[in-house]
Amino acid sequence: MGMIAGIDLGTTFSALAILNKIGRPEVVPNSEGERLTPSVVYFDEDQDATVRVGIEALNCRQLNPDRAIRWIKRHMGDSQWRKTFGERVWTPEEISSLILKKLKQDAEMIYPNIQHVVISVPAHFDEVRRKATMDAGAMAGLNVIGIVNEPVAAALYYATTHDVNGRVLVYDLGGGTFDVTIMDVSGQNIQIVCNQGDHALGGVDFDRKILQMFEKTYQEQTGQPLITNSQEQAQYEDEAEDVKKTLSRRPVAKKILYGKAGSARVEITQAQFEEAVEPLV
């Protein structure tokens, strides 16, 4: 029997893991040597719309953000979502399959015998989204033998390293989706009590609150908008994420904003950020 891998097909990052020789989970590094692969796909402007996936796609996004696809997980199972590049129309499942294919191909450089996969999904995913995830795996050439709820996967891993018995709450706020699950755990036996979530709430929405603060500050200081095109949008989305990370470590983040009307200085405190995101939490 071939090796079984577990895949976290995330909104912002994805990863593939296997059980190593001593039975411990091990995240397999990608071809860039990183354990996390950005869930980004970029289509070149050539006639064939050459596809780039992962960090390469993320870097190319600054060149032409309109040809980059991010956060595709939010559209899984949406029959109305379509994007055209070159002469081909792409569905969310087909975009996701490109990410899954890269994960598998990169992992097979180290473990060439991966034949089956289990893919984790948000607990609140309905059957349409779950089937779409399995379809994406099949398009990537994977034999998807199972779908597991992300909070259950987290609890299973925790149970392998800790003595857990009782009722457990798993709070899973990811890059683009949110789950809260209550479960009864006894060793590695898990029974779901209830779960709730939002497939359109995650870290990216916190970034957007900071982006709004950027825009407000810049307009107050210059009288002009900060963001006027998709390239500037992409640039400041990344800078907003950097500020969010800074505020997780420090009480204040400072940045100079450069726009067509000149520069503006912005300072955001943890308290200001918490107030801005309070409606989300």
Q: Regions from the language model: what does each represent?
A:
Residues 97-106:
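Short, well-ordered amphipathic alpha-helical segments that serve as non-catalytic structural scaffolds
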Residues 1-75, 79, 84-89, 108-281:
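Oxyanion-binding/catalytic loops of NTP- or PPi-dependent enzymes
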